[in-house]
Amino acid sequence: MTNRTRIIFRADGNSQIGLGHVVRSLALAEMLRHDFECVFAIQAPSQELQEQLKKSCDGVIILPVCNHDEERFIHELDAYIAEDVLVVLDGYNFSTAYQQSIKRKGCQLFCIDDIYGYTFVADAILNQAGGVKAEKYKTADYTKLLLGPKYVLLRPPFLEAAKAERSLPTGAVSMFLNLGGADPQNHTLQIAKALKQVQGIEKVEVIVGSAYQHLPELQTWLHHNRKYSLHQNLSAEEMCQLMQSCAIAITSASGVAYEYASVGGLLFVLQTADNQESLYTFLTQNGIAQKYEQIERSIKAGLPTAFEQAVTTQRQYFDGKSDERLMKVFCNMALATGITMREATSNDLMLLFEWANDPEVRKNSFNPNPILLESHTRWLHTKLEDKQAKLYIAEAAGEPAAHIRFEILNGKAIISYLIGSGFRGKGLGHVILQKGVAKLLQQKPELKFVEGLVQQENMASVRAFEKAGFSYGTPDPKFPQAHRFELHPQSIN
């Protein structure tokens, strides 16, 4: 993209709540940063965390400390967002009201979630845990759900590792131990002590993050146990290399488990927080990982076989292409963000003629016959002079993308629209309907009712009207087999 669309990532992280939301948001920023301007908004980050954010993002917005139950919390991004900005939220305090505040600015909104704790009005929701049913979520009609590890948020080294062959590391049998960036309950030390009794492990690589608060206690214990090595604040590259050297890992049921599974190896997981329950269940029930309690039995049964079986299963879920899938989603969202409406003119004659005669358009029209240029010319000139007709061209990045027309009579507008072939399949239908209606209301604020007729087999348009907030009305007697969609003033304003 020449003019990169701005994405504002909003997440918090510290020693109390951990760094999980920040880390996975940064993984997404790493995927998108070359095509988008990525800016991170956060409350009270430590100096170390600020430096980490700057490595992955183009800028950092340090927000004033504000509790989520304060009235001003839902407006904390107001000064930074407009309809040409994408917003990514990752955290449990970004409730429906917070999201609505962003949507009222006209922004495209993307939420990263794993607890489905409230109604979402986001344009897309990502839950990378496997086995999550769409029915768990209460969403707006237009919300797109991205569920499971095919959309996993991995940093670049782990995406590359997922594509590479993985074999059992040679030399001393090493274990990777990481229970999260903060680990407030100090599971790290508890597990490290327990591993002294496990036979067959020659080295233990212990990793903690910048928010870990128990470092002196851990260092004191490790000083007397030489097979343990301590690492802190590793980069993604360093973390990946360390994982590749370890045939075995113990992690929390969090993003780090997905990172190790993308590298490949014998993985054991521990649930260290309530919000890890669904991921813990998915990992252990599908053979991607085993429960921590099974570690001794599994190692005794034979490491080479267990390692190979684990990697084979993990490769079925992690193909290293989640960045490509997510890039496509964000490019479509950016396209929707940039949609503008202008009035059609006589200069659009041939453009509208070509669009109208597109085979796909004719197939879904109530009159499927080809349109002649002479009759099209008369029609356009008549409509442009008609005070009760409004014709708009939707443009994306300055390029004509769609046409939307309204026929107005007695406070009611009948809508008709089409999308150019190069812009189909990008999820733009509902955006064009919404922006077209908004443009019409600016010019005709007295409007009371909008309706549209859609052929039953035209599922793309049916879905677009549903996502745009239209409801099903009584069928039109002239076209009883068609869906009749309607939108009332209270739904519009």
Give short role names for the model-derived ranges.
Residues 163, 169-245:
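Donor-nucleotide binding loops and adjacent catalytic segments primarily
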Residues 257-300:
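Catalytic binding pocket for nucleotide-activated donors in carbohydrate/polymer assembly enzymes
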Residues 338-351, 356, 391, 395-493:
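Acyl-donor (CoA/ACP) binding surface of acyl/acetyltransferases
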Residues 121-186, 215-216:
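A nucleotide-sugar donor-handling region in carbohydrate enzymes
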Residues 301, 319-338:
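C-terminal alpha-helical cap of glycosyltransferases
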Residues 244-254:
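Acidic donor-binding loop of glycosyltransferase active sites
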Residues 9-16, 24-31, 43-56, 62-141:
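Active-site and donor-binding regions of nucleotide-sugar-utilizing enzymes
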Residues 308-320:
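A short, well-ordered alpha-helix in the C-terminal region of glycosyltransferases
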